[in-house]
Amino acid sequence: MASKTQKKNKIRQDIIEAASMYEQYLAGQAFLYVYGNEYFEVMFPVNRFLHLAGVETRLFAKKFYKNAREKTLTTQQFYFSPRHPFEVSKKKLSCLKRLYELTNTKVRILRNMETASVVYKVGISNLEFTLCLTENRDSNGEKINEYFLPMSLRAGRNSTKNGDDYGEVVL
């Protein structure tokens, strides 16, 4: 069985690998999703990477991403909590490394995805994981533009439950 230090080092390595993939395929880019007569655009800002990684840190989101991208992130710069437990982070990171797949393969579009705390207007899923999206709004709740932004990453087979709580599958 791996020690606590070994597990944390593995998570660090996964964060670094995920940051590399995010930088290569997603960071700063917008993607257009068209289904039926509808469409939406998703933007992948670097400050959203931290939340998708599922760990806690005292660093600002952009600094966390920069450290991960430059491979200078240390195991002392992130930690786990009841809100962001180790096992969930481990699952999220395996999906975060593959997040770009939602931009170049067939996906399911979900509308009005409801979780315990939030209703997401749109979600994108490959049936292994789901990216929950939110409108791009400022701190006053005013819409900034038409882009949707990554807000949450749901990992595992239950990422698109067949039920009303996960909204309407439209594609």
Describe the residue ranges of each PLM region:
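An acidic, glycine-rich, mixed-charge low-complexity segment common to nucleic-acid enzymes
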Residues: 1-118
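Conserved binding-pocket/active-site segment within a compact domain
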Residues: 91-171
